[in-house]
Amino acid sequence: MKRQLEAYCAHLRNERQVSEHTSQGYRRDLEKVIAYCEEHGIADWQALQIQQLRQLIARLHHHGQSPRSLARLLSAVRGLYRYLNREGLCQHDPANGLSAPKGERRLPKVLDTDRALQLLDGGVDDDFIARRDQAILELFYSSGLRLSELTNLDLDHLDLAAGLVQVLGKGGKARVLPVGRKAREALQAWYRLRGIGNPRDRAVFITRQGNRISPRAVRLRVKVAGERELGQHLHPHMLRHSFASHVLESSQDLRAVQEMLGHADISTTQIYTHLDFQHLAAVYDSAHPRAKRSKGTDS
């Protein structure tokens, strides 16, 4: 079972071109299934049945795994069995028809427009780290990139004259996104200093040593910026969420936002309509005269 898991993970990286983060997540989930199989004397993937997989899901849920994590595990199992069936190594899928326990879908955390501008409009020193970090923040918010999409950018993926960036998203799907004026200006300022790092490759964002910046380093730099400018915890995906929410709020074009985010299913994008409704409800409650409660009344 472990040998076939290794082959599947190699397939994900080399043929599906998923990120290392996604590949490792699938590996961890499938290792839980293997551990369960070893515990119950299940020798191979063909022998695993739906009843046993259902029992594993119930056990993990009982021990505190979230519905979202369990849904991801089932997705990993389905992907593995699609691969095994295609390779002629298996003839069924025990995850077929199984679903994770339902859970409350949490709305993504976003910055409102004023807070986003506060983050981006802080003073920037004209040095290597400051210019690089500013360009990273501006590009995240301007184009709604995933963390892996940003760190994988090469110089020839950006056309600043045209205001476009080409990214490789999940499943190796390419898309072209607009880059706003402020982000272009920040990138141009960064390019002027980038050569100081004696770059060893064509990565857009590099360290002082000339190496491509890592996802971990970007998360840290975004966190530092959030604490410095906003006094709050900030992570890269919050900037992507903020981009999506603000574009949808202004345009009301859900399909366009779906394409820009690279979502395969529009239901994933629809979560931002709930954020927009939250904002509208807050405005209504604070502004509409019939929404304000009289003091001392409960009804």
Swiss-Prot record:
Q: Pfam families of this UniProt entry?
A: Phage_int_SAM_1, Phage_integrase
Record's keyword annotation contains Cell division? yes
Keywords carried by this UniProt record = Cell cycle, Cell division, Chromosome partition, Cytoplasm, DNA integration, DNA recombination, DNA-binding
One GO MF annotation is: DNA binding
The Core-binding (CB) domain sits at: 1-85
In the UniProt record, does the keyword DNA-binding occur?
Answer: yes
Q: Which InterPro entries match?
A: CB (IPR044068), DNA_brk_join_enz (IPR011010), Integrase-like_cat_sf (IPR013762), Integrase_catalytic (IPR002104), Integrase_recombinase_N (IPR010998), Integrase_SAM-like_N (IPR004107), Recomb_XerC (IPR011931), Tyrosine_recombinase_XerC/XerD (IPR023009)
* GO biological processes: cell division; chromosome segregation; DNA transposition
Q: Which family does it belong to?
A: Belongs to the 'phage' integrase family. XerC subfamily.
Assembly and binders? Forms a cyclic heterotetrameric complex composed of two molecules of XerC and two molecules of XerD.
Q: Which PANTHER family match?
A: PHAGE INTEGRASE-RELATED (PTHR30349), TYROSINE RECOMBINASE XERC (PTHR30349:SF81)
What does the function comment of this entry state?
Site-specific tyrosine recombinase, which acts by catalyzing the cutting and rejoining of the recombining DNA molecules. The XerC-XerD complex is essential to convert dimers of the bacterial chromosome into monomers to permit their segregation at cell division. It also contributes to the segregational stability of plasmids.
Name of this chain's protein: Tyrosine recombinase XerC
Q: Which gene encodes it?
A: xerC
